[in-house]
């Protein structure tokens, strides 16, 4: 009997694995790994792929030499190396430095005009963020109160919003936070 135990201890090939143990990772782990690979691969989109192909072409000698590539890039952007504006068809500079006439206010106006959101969309976004913050253990409530101030609409909408957040906080066992929310709700009414 001791011979068998010694043989098992010395020869691992005779040891049988349990049915639950296998060499490949579990299904969930494989799914997580695949998701990570997709996320990491998302950064390597067409831009990175085209850069890789250009580098490979330059290494193999089938593409444009680097000196000609610089001039073609300059033609494409319309700027020479000395930051002078150029005509698209030629390498002759037009003259003068290029400056931007846009201010930060113009940019903010364009962003709001290009993507107008309704009150419902904004409030739904705030509610999603609030619920996420509520579920985090040990959070400070100042951030949540700041988000609650961003709720848009009449007082009836704000009141419903506060009531739904109070219910969510009670569900998450945040009694002290519920007290603070009820005080704010009374002040609002």
From Swiss-Prot:
It is found in: Nucleus. It holds the Pfam family INT_SG_DDX_CT_C. GO terms for cellular component: nucleus. The keyword Cell inner membrane does not apply. Its main location: nucleus. InterPro entries: INT_SG_DDX_CT_C, Integrator_subunit6. Residues 81-119 are annotated as: Disordered. Disulfide bonds: none annotated. Testis specific. Expressed in cancer cell lines. Keywords: Nucleus. PANTHER family: DEAD/H BOX POLYPEPTIDE 26/DICE1-RELATED, INTEGRATOR COMPLEX SUBUNIT 6. Belongs to the CT45 family. This is Cancer/testis antigen family 45 member A3. It comes from Homo sapiens (Human). The lineage of its organism: Eukaryota, Metazoa, Chordata, Craniata, Vertebrata. The gene is CT45A3.
């Amino acid at each position: 009997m001791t011979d068998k135990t010694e043989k098992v201890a010395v020869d691992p090939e005779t040891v049988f694995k349990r049915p639950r143990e296998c060499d490949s990772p579990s299904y969930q782990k494989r799914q997580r790994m695949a998701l990570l690979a997709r996320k990491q691969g998302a950064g390597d989109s067409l831009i990175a792929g085209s850069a890789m192909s250009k580098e490979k072409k330059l290494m193999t000698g089938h593409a444009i030499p680097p000196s000609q590539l610089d001039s073609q890039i300059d033609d494409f952007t319309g700027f020479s190396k000395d930051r002078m504006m150029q005509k698209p068809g030629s390498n002759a500079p037009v003259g003068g430095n290029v400056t931007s006439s846009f201010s930060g206010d113009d940019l903010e106006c364009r962003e709001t005009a290009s993507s107008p959101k309704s009150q419902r969309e904004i409030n739904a976004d705030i509610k999603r963020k609030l619920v996420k913050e509520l579920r985090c253990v040990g959070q400070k409530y100042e951030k949540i109160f700041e988000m609650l101030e961003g709720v848009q609409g009449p007082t009836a909408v704000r009141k419903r919003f506060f009531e739904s957040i109070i219910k969510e906080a009670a569900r998450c066992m945040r009694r002290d936070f519920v007290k603070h929310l009820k005080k704010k709700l009374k002040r609002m009414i």
